[in-house]
Amino acid sequence: MSKFSFNIHHQHKKARSGIIVTAHGEMRTPAFMPVGTRGTVKAMLPESVAETGADILLGNTYHLMLQPTAERIVQLGGLHKFMNWDKPILTDSGGFQVMSLSKLCKITEEGVSFSSHINGDKYMLTPERSTEIQYLLGSTITMAFDECTPYPATFEEAKTSMQLTTRWANRSRNAFVKREGYAQFGIIQGSVYEELREQSAKDLVELDFEGYAIGGLAVGEGQELMFKVLDYAPEFLPQNKPRYLMGVGKPVDIIGAVSRGIDMFDCVIPTRSGRNGQAFTKYGTVNIRNSKYADDNKPLEHDCLCPACRNYSKAYLHHLVRIGEILGSMLMTWHNLTYFQNLMSRIRAYIKLGKDFDFDS
């Protein structure tokens, strides 16, 4: 089994491209991770996701602990076997979903107590329990338990939240079972305050995580403020470890973040947009519901090799989406995931050539 490692092969200014080696194979960076919240990427077969070029998927601790439960998944051979995916899987810690989805959520030093959004059952999620669940799932990359600081937050509010995340990171690290080829990432917080981001990074770097995530962005602060934070935050992190920007997925944001030193991304945008009839293309977004596509016999993109573009016209996709056929969601999602993986491939090629990004989609 391979050791977990990050090898930077090319660098252009702050942008890096390389390979992350894991127990479940290699992943190319910069990488985009399709979101498989409940053990599936919506409207896609796992093998179809792999065909788009994805090297890694994201799963969600909160949803999987509720249904079908981590204990059931481990009895069935682990998440990889359960969902028929043999490449790396990253699982988030569940904290964000607990705080955003559950009813009567209460945050204490111990963790977060909450009621299930499904049936109202009461749970307690702590750093130790979150780490245990991710271990049971067999996650290739485990995320430390954190509090995602809401925006806007005053300096003092952000400081209190960041310090709690640091204490939880210590407990997450102590609970993590180290195995060859597996990793745990710490999550730096601090909202839009440079002083807090620097302190958070300093504290977490001392815990020697295998990689680091920048959390608490894309929560309403806007692109300008997000990029301002990314102008300095990655510089506080080790050069030789992966950097993951959580929940960011607009193409222009990915390109801007890569140019600021980010290596990994996840977002529901390509899948959710596909199910809602929106396609991403090199020429901008296409709302396939628009009546102007009803008689359009051309593909979404002429040079895209996904099944939607190879075999079907915009008129057919328009028809499927307008009448609510499942195939419409499948084809639109397949196209969008292909687009995002092609975008990452293009980004990696530009870094290898030492070229500035001259595209924004």
Swiss-Prot record:
<dbReference type="InterPro" id="IPR050076">
    <property type="entry name" value="ArchSynthase1/Queuine_TRR"/>
</dbReference>
<feature type="region of interest" description="RNA binding; important for wobble base 34 recognition">
    <location>
        <begin position="271"/>
        <end position="275"/>
    </location>
</feature>
<dbReference type="GO" id="GO:0008479">
    <property type="term" value="F:tRNA-guanosine(34) queuine transglycosylase activity"/>
</dbReference>
<keyword id="KW-0328">Glycosyltransferase</keyword>
<keyword id="KW-0479">Metal-binding</keyword>
<comment type="similarity">
    <text>Belongs to the queuine tRNA-ribosyltransferase family.</text>
</comment>
<feature type="binding site">
    <location>
        <position position="304"/>
    </location>
    <ligand>
        <name>Zn(2+)</name>
    </ligand>
</feature>
<feature type="binding site">
    <location>
        <position position="189"/>
    </location>
    <ligand>
        <name>substrate</name>
    </ligand>
</feature>
<feature type="region of interest" description="RNA binding">
    <location>
        <begin position="247"/>
        <end position="253"/>
    </location>
</feature>
<comment type="pathway">
    <text>tRNA modification; tRNA-queuosine biosynthesis.</text>
</comment>
<feature type="binding site">
    <location>
        <begin position="92"/>
        <end position="96"/>
    </location>
    <ligand>
        <name>substrate</name>
    </ligand>
</feature>
<keyword id="KW-0808">Transferase</keyword>
<protein>
    <recommendedName>
        <fullName>Queuine tRNA-ribosyltransferase</fullName>
        <ecNumber>2.4.2.29</ecNumber>
    </recommendedName>
</protein>
<dbReference type="GO" id="GO:0005737">
    <property type="term" value="C:cytoplasm"/>
</dbReference>
<dbReference type="InterPro" id="IPR004803">
    <property type="entry name" value="TGT"/>
</dbReference>
<keyword id="KW-0671">Queuosine biosynthesis</keyword>
<dbReference type="Pfam" id="PF01702">
    <property type="entry name" value="TGT"/>
</dbReference>
<comment type="function">
    <text>Catalyzes the base-exchange of a guanine (G) residue with the queuine precursor 7-aminomethyl-7-deazaguanine (PreQ1) at position 34 (anticodon wobble position) in tRNAs with GU(N) anticodons (tRNA-Asp, -Asn, -His and -Tyr). Catalysis occurs through a double-displacement mechanism. The nucleophile active site attacks the C1' of nucleotide 34 to detach the guanine base from the RNA, forming a covalent enzyme-RNA intermediate. The proton acceptor active site deprotonates the incoming PreQ1, allowing a nucleophilic attack on the C1' of the ribose to form the product.</text>
</comment>
<dbReference type="InterPro" id="IPR036511">
    <property type="entry name" value="TGT-like_sf"/>
</dbReference>
<dbReference type="InterPro" id="IPR002616">
    <property type="entry name" value="tRNA_ribo_trans-like"/>
</dbReference>
<feature type="active site" description="Proton acceptor">
    <location>
        <position position="92"/>
    </location>
</feature>
<dbReference type="GO" id="GO:0002099">
    <property type="term" value="P:tRNA wobble guanine modification"/>
</dbReference>
<feature type="binding site">
    <location>
        <position position="335"/>
    </location>
    <ligand>
        <name>Zn(2+)</name>
    </ligand>
</feature>
<feature type="active site" description="Nucleophile">
    <location>
        <position position="266"/>
    </location>
</feature>
<keyword id="KW-0819">tRNA processing</keyword>
<dbReference type="GO" id="GO:0046872">
    <property type="term" value="F:metal ion binding"/>
</dbReference>
<dbReference type="GO" id="GO:0101030">
    <property type="term" value="P:tRNA-guanine transglycosylation"/>
</dbReference>
<dbReference type="GO" id="GO:0008616">
    <property type="term" value="P:queuosine biosynthetic process"/>
</dbReference>
<feature type="binding site">
    <location>
        <position position="306"/>
    </location>
    <ligand>
        <name>Zn(2+)</name>
    </ligand>
</feature>
<feature type="binding site">
    <location>
        <position position="309"/>
    </location>
    <ligand>
        <name>Zn(2+)</name>
    </ligand>
</feature>
<comment type="subunit">
    <text>Homodimer. Within each dimer, one monomer is responsible for RNA recognition and catalysis, while the other monomer binds to the replacement base PreQ1.</text>
</comment>
<keyword id="KW-0862">Zinc</keyword>
<feature type="binding site">
    <location>
        <position position="146"/>
    </location>
    <ligand>
        <name>substrate</name>
    </ligand>
</feature>
<feature type="binding site">
    <location>
        <position position="216"/>
    </location>
    <ligand>
        <name>substrate</name>
    </ligand>
</feature>
